[in-house]
Structure formats: structure tokens, C-alpha cells
Swiss-Prot record:
Localisation: Endoplasmic reticulum
Cellular component aspect of the GO annotation: endoplasmic reticulum
Single Gene Ontology MF annotation: cytochrome-b5 reductase activity, acting on NAD(P)H
Protein name: Cytochrome b5 reductase 4
Family according to the record: Belongs to the flavoprotein pyridine nucleotide cytochrome reductase family.
SMART domains tied to this protein: Cyt-b5
Annotated CS domain residues: 167-258
Cofactor(s) essential for the protein: FAD
PROSITE patterns listed in its UniProt record: CS (PS51203), CYTOCHROME_B5_1 (PS00191), CYTOCHROME_B5_2 (PS50255), FAD_FR (PS51384)
Superkingdom, taxonomy of origin: Eukaryota
Species in which this protein is naturally found: Xenopus tropicalis (Western clawed frog)
Residues holding heme: 89, 112
Keyword terms: Endoplasmic reticulum, FAD, Flavoprotein, Heme, Iron, Metal-binding, NAD, Oxidoreductase
Gene3D superfamilies xref list: 2.60.40.790, Cytochrome b5-like heme/steroid binding domain, Nucleotide-binding domain of ferredoxin-NADP reductase (FNR) module, Translation factors
Length: 523
């Protein structure tokens, strides 16, 4: 029997409920809470209308189910009948109908980022979207198989059939020596970077995903023979080539790379892939201030994962029978540049700055974790591109509270790697002085690098505070955001609670900054 907690979920003052302020919410009927939905999904009732069958759904068929009484949506390539969920949605039927009969991935990412839709809607799953993705044949002809024998296990991928309407797409070869197996992926794209390559080797299953613009190429295979846990990933940026090297446990000759698994050799829209999680070990947990901690999370052996600047990961925990997910942007263990190279560049660790909410849906559980416990972390997600800071001269980072997290590595990156930079300014809003995260380090950095300036603003300062006071406003931003020279390339990033971000964007638009000059990170 489901053990239902007495308090509502999420808790009344949790960040999830607070974050919903500003979105349209409707009163739910009695018996239509999240916990009531969980009870319904566990009741055994057929919520799909297909009596347990899973089907492939075409775009045309999906579009036909676009009514309140018959509503299907697609989320990351999977199709759900959300008709029975309509009355349980806190945003109301109108919000869900925005994605009726079409792809609702963006809608769920915006409104339900804190809930794992795969768990919440698993009893509503109808099947997989029959996506017209770029795929490479899993099988080669018998003639090609004969050729492979002369290639020492190399898959003659160049001869594989291609069903792509695209002019170019990735393909792969593999080859072996007595002690080593190498998988080579050819992306046909220059300037491939290591951060766009995610590889996991777990229990003799190799999963490699390469992000190419809005698309994703996936290798997914159960290997023919055991290999050592640790893998090596080499990226040749100019050639657009990626090599995954694995050491054999036994010096035997492989006849094939292995058994293809779900999604192997596919090339499709990144948004259509489900999030992939791996279990990571909590290595340390330290206090930053009275309510915020720095978590150091160790990636498992055989995992190659580097989070691009400005991107986040999802952290997942199972709470009261529901998989709760929450986005967090990795930071460095210290704001100062010297520490960046000694800590964050340990590619097997991620650092997460997390504010603990006593009545939050997930952070109290994170606070109770001890060193050695495991949590699940997803592949990186995000839309920020490093091209946005190429040749930039002025960077302004507008943050409120833990909205500073995406700014930390971005600040380090522009100060270290952008030669055109003339000015980087952090405009940091908090309530009280004790809320200012890494205050001493911010001040040290401003002394260490003359290009960096910090403007600390408090809305509820003590009488001893001599700095800036107030809240985000048109006049404050007008006085604080000034180009170093007329016509200089500028980037303004903003992050914080939704209301803060919405206000800030409105003020910046009124000040005449273009959409290309403003980027919003959403908490």
C-alpha cells in the first residue's frame, strides 16, 4: 500500500510552490492533488485506453488527439495520453492544451522541471513517436561483412546505407588490437569540443552521445567482451573525430563490437531523447553560509561528462514514490581562478551550490545525505552557446540569491578565455549581508582583476551596511549597465526567481537592449 505523508506535496512553502507564483494557477477539485494522482496511477486502472499495448505514433495521428476529452502529447519522443491528468494539473487544462496533439517537451521543461514526467505519466504512456530521424542501418550486407574480416573488426560504416534527408550526419567505425578496442565517431563537423561528448561505460554497456547543434548522435551497445571500467575519450576538434578507447580484459579477437541496444546509431533532435541518468557518489558537503551548501559529487568510473559553461544538470531523487528532479548549474569549488584549475578541472567531480529550503520538496533530503551516498545526475542540458561570448567586450551578470550559480563559471570563462573582454560586472541582489554567497571571494576577485567589478545590493540591509540598497529597477540598471565604448559588443545575463528575471528582462528591453544582447537563465 502507498504510504502517503500527512503533509501536502510539494510542501506549502517549498521552492516549487513559490516558483509557481506568476504562472496561472487554478483551484483543483477535491481529490485532485498530486498525491491523489499518484494513487490513481497505482490503482491499476487503464489510463491509456489501449489496454497495455504500446504503439508507434505518427505526427499525423498525434495531431488528431488535440481535444480536452482526447488529448495526447509527445515529450522527448514518447507519447502520453494526458486526458486523465487534465483535472490534476495545477496550471489548469488551458496550460496543457497548449501542447495538445503535438510536442510538449518545452512546456513540461518550463512548468514541470521539478517532476520527472517519466515517473508521473508512466501509466499514461501510449508508445514511441515514429520520428523521421536520421538513422544508420544496424546491419551491413553480407558482402560488407566479408570486407570487415579484412579490416580487423572495423565496421565499414562508410558503406552503410543512409536514410538521411540531411547532407551530412555522423557515422562510426571500430577497430581493435590485441589489448585495445577503439570506437571512432566521425561527426563531419569542425570544432567539436569535449564538452559535447558524453560517454558512459557501465556493466559492459557502452553509451556514447554526441551533441551536434540541435541534434544528438547516439552509440548504445552491449559489448561483445568485458573491458576495463575506465575508458579514454579523445577529441580531434579540427577533424571532427571522437575516439573512445577501451582496454580489453582478455586478449581475444572480437568478431563484432557487440549487441546494439535501444537508439543505437540514431541521429535525431536532442529534445527528443529522454534524459539519461547515472548514479554519482557524494564526495563532500561543506557550508557556504547559514542555508547554502557546496556539494561535491563524484562521477562513476567509466563516465566522461563535462558540463558546458552556462548549462545545467538535473538531479533526481525518489521521494514518496515520485521521482523528483531539479535543475542545478555546476560551479567551481571556488570563485578565484587559481582554485578553478586545481578543483573544477578534476573532470570526475561536479560541484553544486544548493540552497536548503526547510520545507522544500528535495533540498531537505539532500541535506540529509552523508558522504558516500548516491544520487542520480543527468546529462547536461541548456541553450547557452559559447558563440554568444565570442569577441564580447562588456559582460554584465545580473543575479539574485542562488541565481549566481550559472554566473560563476561564465565569469571565470570570460576572464580567462575571452581576449576581447574589457569589463565584467556582477550586479548581485540579496536580502541581507549574510545572504551574499562567496562575498569575500567576490571582493578578492575584484581586487585581483581590474576588469571585474562587483555591485552588491541588499533589499533588507542592517544599519551597518554602507553598500547599495534597493531592488531591481529600471533606474538601477540604467545606472549600472554602461558600455566601455559606444557600439561595443555586450552580453547581459540574468538569473534568479522567475518574477525577478521577468522584471529584469522588461527593464532591459525598455533600456533598448536587443534580444541578442540579453540571455536569461531560469532557476
Amino acid at each position: 500500500m502507498l504510504n502517503v505523508p500527512s503533509q501536502s506535496f510539494p510542501a506549502p512553502s517549498s521552492q516549487q510552490r513559490v516558483a509557481a507564483i506568476g504562472r496561472s494557477k487554478v483551484p483543483l477539485k477535491p481529490g485532485r492533488s498530486l498525491m491523489d494522482w499518484i494513487r490513481l496511477t497505482k490503482s491499476g486502472k487503464d489510463l491509456t485506453g489501449l489496454k497495455g499495448r504500446l504503439i508507434d505514433v505518427t505526427e499525423e495521428e498525434l495531431a488528431q488527439h488535440n481535444k480536452k476529452e482526447d488529448c495526447w502529447i509527445c515529450i522527448r519522443g514518447m507519447v502520453y495520453n494526458i486526458t486523465p491528468y487534465m483535472e490534476y494539473h495545477p496550471g489548469g487544462e488551458e496550460e496543457l492544451m497548449k501542447a495538445a496533439g503535438r510536442d510538449g517537451t518545452d512546456l513540461f521543461d518550463q512548468v514541470h522541471r521539478w517532476v520527472n514526467y517519466e515517473s508521473m505519466l508512466k501509466e499514461c504512456l501510449i508508445g514511441r513517436m515514429a520520428i523521421k530521424h536520421v538513422s544508420i542501418s544496424k546491419e551491413v550486407t553480407s558482402v560488407e561483412n566479408k570486407m570487415n574480416k579484412h579490416l580487423n573488426g572495423s565496421v565499414a560504416s562508410s558503406k552503410m546505407s543512409r536514410t538521411s534527408s540531411k547532407e551530412s550526419h555522423p557515422w562510426y567505425d571500430w577497430f581493435q588490437t590485441e589489448s585495445l578496442v577503439t570506437v571512432a565517431v566521425y561527426t563531419k563537423m569542425k570544432n567539436v569540443c569535449s564538452e559535447l561528448v558524453i560517454v558512459d561505460h557501465l556493466e559492459n554497456v557502452l553509451r556514447g552521445e554526441i551533441i551536434i547543434g540541435d541534434y544528438s548522435y547516439l552509440l548504445h551497445s552491449e559489448l561483445s567482451h568485458p573491458v576495463q571500467k575506465d575508458i579514454e575519450v579523445k577529441v580531434s576538434a579540427t577533424a571532427g573525430k571522437i575516439e573512445i578507447k577501451m582496454k580489453k580484459k582478455e586478449p581475444v579477437s572480437w568478431k563484432s563490437l557487440g549487441q546494439p541496444m535501444d537508439g543505437h546509431n540514431s541521429f535525431l533532435k536532442h529534445s527528443q531523447r529522454g534524459l539519461y541518468y547515472r548514479k554519482c557518489r557524494l564526495a563532500s558537503k561543506t557550508d557556504i553560509n547559514y542555508n547554502t551548501k557546496l556539494f561535491c559529487v563524484q562521477l562513476p568510473q567509466g563516465c566522461h561528462l563535462q558540463v558546458p559553461v552556462g548549462h545545467h544538470i538535473y538531479l533526481k531523487m525518489n521521494i514518496s514514490g515520485v521521482d523528483i528532479v531539479k535543475p542545478y548549474t555546476p560551479v567551481a569549488s571556488c570563485l578565484l581562478p587559481d582554485a578553478q584549475y586545481s578543483t573544477f578541472c578534476n573532470k570526475q567531480c561536479l560541484y553544486l551550490m544548493i540552497k536548503i529550503y526547510p520545507n522544500g520538496s528535495i533540498t531537505p533530503h539532500l541535506e540529509n545525505l552523508t558522504v558516500g551516498d548516491y544520487i542520480s545526475i543527468s546529462n547536461p542540458q541548456g541553450t547557452f552557446s559559447s558563440f554568444q561570448i565570442e569577441n564580447v567586450m562588456d559582460v554584465f551578470l545580473v543575479a539574485a540569491g542562488t541565481g549566481i550559480t550559472p554566473m560563476i563559471r561564465l565569469l571565470q570563462h570570460v576572464l580567462t578565455c575571452v581576449s576581447s573582454l574589457r569589463k565584467a560586472k556582477l550586479i548581485f541582489f540579496n536580502k541581507k549581508e549574510e545572504d551574499i554567497l562567496w562575498k569575500e571571494q567576490v571582493e578578492e576577485l575584484s581586487l585581483a582583476d581590474k576588469r571585474f567589478e562587483a555591485q552588491l545590493i541588499l533589499s533588507e540591509p542592517s544599519v551597518k551596511w554602507t553598500g547599495y540598497r534597493g531592488q531591481i529597477s529600471y533606474s538601477l540598471l540604467n545606472e549600472s549597465i554602461l558600455r566601455t565604448e559606444e557600439g561595443s559588443k555586450i552580453l547581459i545575463c540574468i538569473c534568479g526567481p522567475n518574477a525577478f528575471v521577468d522584471q529584469g528582462i522588461s527593464f532591459l528591453q525598455d533600456l533598448g537592449f536587443s534580444k541578442e544582447e540579453v540571455f536569461a537563465f531560469r532557476e
